Amino acid sequence: MKGGGGGGGGGGGGKRRWKVLVIGVLVLVILSMLVPLAFLLGLHNGFHSPGFVTVQPASSFESFTRINATKHTQRDVSERVDEVLQKINPVLPKKSDINVGSRDVNATSGTDSKKRGLPVSPTVVANPSPANKTKSEASYTGVQRKIVSGDETWRTCEVKYGSYCLWREENKEPMKDAKVKQMKDQLFVARAYYPSIAKMPSQSKLTRDMKQNIQEFERILSESSQDADLPPQVDKKLQKMEAVIAKAKSFPVDCNNVDKKLRQILDLTEDEASFHMKQSVFLYQLAVQTMPKSLHCLSMRLTVEHFKSDSLEDPISEKFSDPSLLHFVIISDNILASSVVINSTVVHARDSKNFVFHVLTDEQNYFAMKQWFIRNPCKQSTVQVLNIEKLELDDSDMKLSLSAEFRVSFPSGDLLASQQNRTHYLSLFSQSHYLLPKLFDKLEKVVILDDDVVVQRDLSPLWDLDMEGKVNGAVKSCTVRLGQLRSLKRGNFDTNACLWMSGLNVVDLARWRALGVSETYQKYYKEMSSGDESSEAIALQASLLTFQDQVYALDDKWALSGLGYDYYINAQAIKNAAILHYNGNMKPWLELGIPNYKNYWRRHLSREDRFLSDCNVNP
C-alpha cells in the first residue's frame, strides 16, 4: 500500500510539472509574437521624449533620437581614446606637480624611452621668466597676433596638448562652410522647437513640415562638410527652413522646454568637439612617434645589403681611441639624422681628418647604420658605429636611451605667456650618457651631439675651451629657471639658476671620472626611485642634481634651440648660431616638421644613395 501511495503521489507531481512546462511554452510563444509587433509599432521608442524625430542614422547631425541613443557609445569611444592617450603618456608622479601633456605626451613610460620622431615629453608646469636671449621681441609678433587677450581657448590648448596646438594653429586651412554652419544653426533651432509644436494637435501640418525639413537637413549635412559639397537649390531649403522656424516661434511655447533642448544640443556639441580634439591629438602624436614607412624601408634595405656584402666587420682603427684627435659622440637610432649631423660637422670643419665620430645605436639599427656609413663615407673623417646592447660593461643598463625631452608649460594668466610661446622643450642626458666614461676609457674629452642638430660652424675651437674645472660645457636656457619647475621638490637647488640643455655638450671625461659623476647620478636615481614618481621625473631631478655647479656655460651663439616647436625664431639668430637644435616634436625628417627650418637640415642629406629613391625617402 505504501508503495502504491508513493506511486500515486509521484504521478500527481509529474502532471504538475507537465502543466508548468506547457504554461512556460505558451508564454514563450506569446512573447515571440508580441515582441516583434512591439518593434514594428515603434513601442521600443517609448523611452524618448515625445515628439523627437527618428531618422536613419547617417552623421553626427542626425536627430536628437539618434544622438541620445549614441551618446553613451560616443562617450565610450572618448574614454577609449583617453585610455590610449594615457598609455602614450609617461606615468608621471602623483605627488609632484608635473602634469602630462598628450606625450607631448615621451609616449612610453619607462627609462628607455626613445624618440623616433620624438616621443612626447612629460609636461612641467612653470612660472614666467625672462625671454631667451637668442630670440628678439619682434620674433613673437606672430604669436601676439594669434593669441589675443580674449582667446583663452588657444592658450588652454597649448598648455594641455603642447606642440599639437602650435602645429594646428600654423597649418589650419580656412574652410568655406558659411552655408553649412547656417544650416547647422537652423537645424539646432528647429530641433529645439519641434517637441513643443508636436504637442499641439491643431498644428499637425506644421509638425510634418518641421519633421520633413529636419530630416532633409540631416541628410544633406551627413554628406556635406563645406559649401562646395552642398546640393543645388540649397538657398531655397534655407529659406523654407527659416519660414518654418519663424512660424513655430509665433506660437506660445514652453520656453523652459526650448531652453532645455538647446542646452542638450550645446552639451552634445561640446562633447563631440572634445572627442575630435582628443582624436586629433592622438593622431598627431602617432605621426610624431611612429617611424615613417620610407625610413623603415631604408633601414630594412640597408640591413639586407649589409649581410649580402663580403666584408661584415670593420677593421679596428687606432683612431677610435686616440686622445689626440677630436672625438664626437652621437646617440641615435635614426640613420638619416645621424648622417646629417656628421655631414654638416665635416663640411664646416677646417681639418676633417682629425674628426672621429662614435655613433651609439641599438641592435635593431646597428647593421643598417653601419652599412650606411660604409656606402656614404664622410670625407676624411672616421666613423665608428657601436651596438650599445653588445658592449660589455659591468652593472650597467645596456639598452639605448636617447636624450630625454621635457615639455615646460606656463600656467594661464601669466603676462609673459600672453606675449610669447607658452610651451618650451628641455632636453637632458639619458641613462646612456652616463656610460660614456666607461665606453671611452682612453679618451679625456668628447663633444656630444644630439641627432636632431645641424652644424653650421667649425667645432674645433670647443677643444680649446678652458672649462675652469667643470665637467659639462653646455648652452644654458634662461627661458625657464630651476625655481619655476614645480616637479623639483628634492635637493638643494639654486632657484634662480638657468637650465642647461643637451644638444651640444663638451664633456671632460677625465674630470667626470675623477668626480664620479656617473656614480653620483645612480645614487640620486636610486634614492628617488623609492617613491611613486615616474622614471622621467626621477631622471630630470637626478640629472639636475648631479651636474649642479658642474656646468660651464657656453656662449649662446654656439647653439640655438627650439626649431622643433617654435615657428617664430628670428632669422638672424638662426644665421648666427653654430648649431641648430630641432628639439621638440616637429623634427625635420617628419612631414610635420616646420617647413621654414627644413632646408637647413635637407642641404646636408646625402641624396645620391639609390636606396633613398627606392624607398621614396624625401623628408
Curated annotation (Swiss-Prot):
User: What organism is listed for this UniProt entry?
Assistant: Arabidopsis thaliana (Mouse-ear cress)
InterPro entries, per database record = GAUT, Glyco_trans_8, Nucleotide-diphossugar_trans
Q: In which pathway does it act?
A: Glycan metabolism; pectin biosynthesis
Record localization? Golgi apparatus membrane
Supply the name of the protein. Answer: Probable galacturonosyltransferase 7
Taken from the record's topology, the Cytoplasmic segments are 1-19
What are the transmembrane regions? Answer: 20-40
Positions of the UniProt region annotated as Disordered = 95-139
